[in-house]
Amino acid sequence: MRRTALVLTASAPEGRASELAQFPSAVPAPHPPPVSLPSPTAAPGFAMGNVPSAVKHCLSYQQLLREHLWIGDSVAGALDPAQETSQLSGLPEFVKIVEVGPRDGLQNEKVIVPTDIKIEFINRLSQTGLSVIEVTSFVSSRWVPQVAAGATEISVFGAASESFSKKNINCSIEESMGKFEEVVKSARHMNIPARGYVSCALGCPYEGSITPQKVTEVSKRLYGMGCYEISLGDTIGVGTPGSMKRMLESVMKEIPPGALAVHCHDTYGQALANILTALQMGINVVDSAVSGLGGCPYAKGASGNVATEDLVYMLNGLGLNTGVNLYKVMEAGDFICKAVNKTTNSKVAQASFNA
């Protein structure tokens, strides 16, 4: 049986963390309002959101949806992987998706999301086949009051930019490394895996361009202290396939691709292209957020993460296995968007729900 890891991120290295409450993952949440979605087995002709009517009634379009989108209990696309991957080289057979919506997504909301809504949201995500879900962060309530919980894995947040490090975690890069070492060491003693993040890997809102060498140095430090995986974040979404390739080439001289992940925001619409570039270079772990939730309180103008729905749709189309049920991800996204009264940023969801 697939197990879902609930991840706690550590973003307050100077001891300003609020008191933690154990996350009640097994506590039944109140029944939410029913989600209105077309059935995965719906007959041809069901409404498809903002897709033009003429296209909706095209038989070939409906066939595409039956094979490629409404995959029911399937964990991979219905298309033949041999047919799809023959067009692109170097792609992994399996891609692990790290869902960051509950943590990175909800931290940017202006209102505090009620605990029962968070629990129901996470419970829904845990039923999608996602193997890793970041549920929250522990940080000072003075800085980011929206998050509080506990988990079975931790992450630490470094940065390749001095200015961003001071804005985001209130200390220099060097100071943060010392704090992170203590956290990772303590986690290892408790047999809790630690993941390392490098923010601003492709650009900084305060310093502009970041050199690949700087990203490599921070990544090497995190990997050396015991982080089993390093997630390289395009925090403000300014990267392109070219800059992604150059950055990864540098980092991969020090860290094997099997220990790397990418975390792309979609500010300039480049997230999926950047992810595809990373996959072709041997990366097989990708962070995403359902409905494209997110942003960063300390990176003004940055849009949300790449939408999990859009990522899974692309990976299905490439014939790659993710273990994720796209239909159930869309249900979870619809639930949280209604709960926080916002419109989904997922193109797949926008094209799939009733207008």
Predicted regions and their residues:
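Catalytic cores and adjacent flexible loops of soluble metabolic enzymes
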Residues: 1-355
